[in-house]
């Protein structure tokens, strides 16, 4: 979706997390929006493309309660949309709704993203959330931390120097973090200005342009200083052989790899990764929906969101999940269609009532099935 030269800082900041609402408000508003678009009560087949994490269960319950049907499963681990399920989903209802969401945990005490407390464990321990996203980005974080701690800036006489570990200079590697050396090292006649080779590293002359981007106390330090946080996202790329099978095991990683420099250098890597995955999945899925013949001639609403999971407090069974809508695609049965950007879909949702007079009574519906006369199955 994003080119390697895209302004990722702008792209990520365009996804405003402050445009959030509780799921208990989001779902009835979404239902009422569908009804305002001509969707018929009792004939709407919702579908969700959520991660398989148990903390996504509460949103699913709310979808069932307000739409009157348990949502079809359109999702894979990590919030990836299984687009090969469009056809069966289209056969299950008159009007169609698809809700895609990546998710990330949030700790209100530390005001940080990426973790969730598991109440069903003996010690209520906290784990990375989304676990799939955490697993995917960890290798990239490790590579970044190695580079941060093995590139040194200093000064020898009047010469500003940069010392780089030999591993980072090995261009024959099949995978790893690769530096944009032309932005960091002084080049003369197309050659890197090498001062000396050490046992495990090399010392170069820093480019004047790069030096200008650094604080004076870093670039001019007489004692070598780790580059640390000054290794910005424009100074490196990642390479890694990944299976390109669409919607396969590595699909989430494929969504993120080009944006990894911005993810690992951000203050909240898990949040940024979840936002980017939501953005990529909306763009990708939208293009498959418009080509899916099963959806032609149907009312359809597809929305992509970021789910923020706040761990349940003592005495609570479910998380306080908040939804951050990103974008929506709306199609009418007459063939007309349009997309809504974040501010537009949020505005449309906020115009809807948070009360749904057509929601089902879950307890009554369950009791009805408990009380129903048994049916003998003949084999």
Q: Where are the regions a protein language model picked out?
A:
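Short glycine-enriched loops at secondary-structure junctions
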Residues: 50-55, 104
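Short, acidic Gly/Pro/Ser/Thr-rich loop/turn segments
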Residues: 54-57, 311-312
